[in-house]
Amino acid sequence: MEEEGHKSLTSHLPQSSSSLSQSREIAKEFTSNIPPPTIKTNSSSSNILKPRLSLQNEVNQLKPAKFPSKMLPPGSLASVKSSSLAKKARPFTASSNPRMPKSAHPISSRSVSASSHFGRPASAVSSSLNSSDDVRSMSDESMESYNDEKSVNASALRTTEDRLRSMEMAYAQLSAKVIPSPSKRPANYKFYEQRIAMLEESLEVERSRTSELQEQFSVALREKAEAEANKIVSQKGMESLEIMLNSMKSENHQRMAMLEENHARVMETAELQHQAELQDFASNIEQKANSLIMEYKNELQSAEEHFSHKIKELTSENELKISRLQEEKDSLLKKVQEGASLAMQRVQNKHDLEKKRLQSAIQPLQEENNSLKQQIEQLQRELASETVVKENLKSSLDQQSANVQKLESTNRALESTIKTLEEDVYTMKNKIIELEGILKSANVERDGLVEKLIAEETLRRKLHNTIQELKGNIRVFCRVRPPLGDGESAQIAFPDQNSEASTIEIVAQAPGSSLTGNGIKQYAFNFDRVFSPETTNEDVFNELSQLIQSAMDGYNVCIFAYGQTGSGKTHTMSSNTGMIPSSVRMIYNRSTSLKERGWEYRMEGQFLEIYNETIIDLLASGNEEEKGKKKLEIYHDTKAGRTTITNITSEPLDTPEQVTWLLDQASKNRSVAATNANEHSSRSHSVFMLHLNGSNSTTGETCRSTLNLIDLAGSERLSSSQSVGERLKETQAINKSLSCLGDVIHALGSGKEGTYIPYRNSKLTNLLQYSLGGNSKTLMFVNISPLKQHVPETLCSLRFATKVNNTQIGTARKVTK
């Protein structure tokens, strides 16, 4: 049986003499054509594919000794199967059933007693153990066959691995040599460059496909060996299990029949013996009683005969004697009856004790009989379950056989594909050799272009700053709000709208003229740019974007919107398309593109308002009491030229979407109130401070700047707003800070060295000290209303903007760390 199982196992295992020898011949033929690898590396050619320093990860994936987490080696699977079968084949040992203690096992303990009592040996245990030993021996033989096959597969996989390593190192050798020179750049350079990229990508794909095919081949071999080993082990296990169950079943039937027969025989013998003993005892008692009665009767008769002849003589004396004897007779009879009843009672007690003893002896036999019946039922259920398992194993085995056949066909197709791929790799190697000179020159030219690009970026920053200085470090843009149908429109003209719009004309009634139309006067104002009502925020930001670039180059930039309430300042600065979100989006996009040139930027945002000369953090969390405990004060670092505010919330800006959240949070916390000019008038100056920190890892350059985007409160005069109470106090504080802003700008434009600049006259100018002076670039938006009723305030705003536009401040300096 063992020899036949071994032959069937070895016949079902995959034979590698043909397929693996063919793989070895293909590997030897291919590796003989690959020269020894000589790797050349070039630190500047970062885009050229380099050989992998270690193939340990791929080797570990290809080694058949390491199995997937969900698949056991055939040996281990066979051992598990055999051990489980052995456990099922040893039902007479206490260890096979963990729920039953060794001393109380029904079969192991009582089979011996039954055999000793009835003279019948229990031989099924040794036969079942021999069957399990046969299963284990077949499992060991299947493992030896599988280990031989595994060593052959491992050698084939190592050959394939060495072949792949040689291909990669040869390709790396050729790729490292491909460094073209700029003097020999051919006309079709771009075509070859694209072709090389395609070849590199194709080679990488084929390499991954080869690795996957090798891994699939190894897994297929393992699964096939496992399936065959499991099939043989399952067959042998099922056969031994069936033999064991049949023997156990027949033995149990024989034992049950024997026990029932012996039990009936014992019961019958005990009953007969008991009846015989009772009959003997009763007959003995009766004989003794009869003998005693006869003795007494004989004595009485003899006495009567002895004294009868004296009765007549001694009548009186005999009567007395007769009465005495009669009493003695009665007492003797009473004693005899009492002795007989006591003897009967003793016999009955002895009978009861014997009956109880027999019943106690019968009860274990009945319990043993019931236990044997339960064991038979359990064995029948196990036999049924094992039959189901057998059927499942048969179906699984058929499925595994079909899968093995599919894998064999797939393996053959993969071997042909590998051969084709090897030929393609050889062809690609020749093509790479042809393109070696082109790649070498292209790489050198690329390095030169990178250096040139870095130099041009530095030059661009200088030229950009020069252009901005020529335009003026303080500039003024005028923007007219589009009419919203809320009143009569004023006469506003844009004479040079078709060219670089820089002039705005307003027709209004001159002061002191009559209402008949006499004294109409035309007012003209010139600024750096003038935007008509049709201009969108995107168009405005296109003009503004150059200053945002200056902020990224390391210059402090201050942009603020000035104008009366309702002139469109908040829409210009804080709407979804306003200057604040557009500026942040531009910085993000620009910083992403500058990463190729070595620049990295970090951004932090702060949002505050100045209300009645008090700084309020618009991003602070908590209730009003907690916010009031934080004291916000302005500190200036003279050496670094930097302004900081204590206890203010600073939010790192990692995405442009965070700016939208900042604007929403600030809008909820900003102070607004209804006035005569606007139902929702901003009663404070809002300041968005964006701190930029840039560094270039290639050149070692660093820059730091602050971008201030300010939405000033309404600039209408007290005579126009007619504010009272709390609104009056707010208007006075707003006008004071705006007046101080004009004084600072005027002092900066005086040009006299040592001139006192009144920064500390207001919180606004004190905060913007390093963003308004010669170390910065300033842009003022003057927003005006298109309504006729607002013309006086419009003229006042335009005159203030003209003063600012006529101011010249010093040259801005770049802030470095």
Swiss-Prot record:
Disordered: annotated span: 1-155
Reaction it catalyzes: ATP + H2O = ADP + phosphate + H(+); ATP + H2O + a kinesin associated with a microtubule at position (n) = ADP + phosphate + a kinesin associated with a microtubule at position (n-1, toward the minus end)
Pfam families documented for this protein: Kinesin
Keywords of the record: ATP-binding, Coiled coil, Cytoplasm, Cytoskeleton, Isomerase, Microtubule, Motor protein, Nucleotide-binding, Nucleus
Compartments reported by the entry: Cytoplasm, Cytoskeleton; Cytoplasm, Cytoskeleton, Spindle; Nucleus
Biological process terms in GO annotation: cytoplasmic microtubule organization; establishment or maintenance of microtubule cytoskeleton polarity; karyogamy involved in conjugation with cellular fusion; meiotic centromere clustering; meiotic spindle assembly; meiotic spindle formation (spindle phase two); microtubule anchoring at mitotic spindle pole body; microtubule bundle formation
Compositional bias ranges of the Polar residues kind: 39-60, 106-116
A GO cellular-component term linked to this record: microtubule minus-end
Superkingdom assignment: Eukaryota
Signal sequence coordinates: none
Enzyme Commission identifier(s): 5.6.1.4
Domain Kinesin motor, chain residue ranges per copy: 473-807
Any GO MF annotation of the entry: ATP hydrolysis activity
Biased composition (Low complexity): 8-23, 76-86, 122-132
Coiled coil: 155-242
PANTHER family xrefs: KINESIN-LIKE PROTEIN KLP-3 (PTHR47972), PROTEIN CLARET SEGREGATIONAL (PTHR47972:SF45)
Family membership noted in the UniProt record: Belongs to the TRAFAC class myosin-kinesin ATPase superfamily. Kinesin family. NCD subfamily.
Chain's role: Minus end-directed microtubule (MT) motor that is involved in spindle microtubule shortening, kinetochore capture, and polarization of cytoplasmic microtubules. During mitosis, promotes spindle microtubule shortening by depolymerization. During metaphase, involved in the recapture of kinetochores displaced from the spindle and their transport towards the spindle pole body; promotes transport both by microtubule end-on pulling and by lateral sliding along the side of the microtubule.
The protein's name in its UniProt record: Kinesin-like protein 2
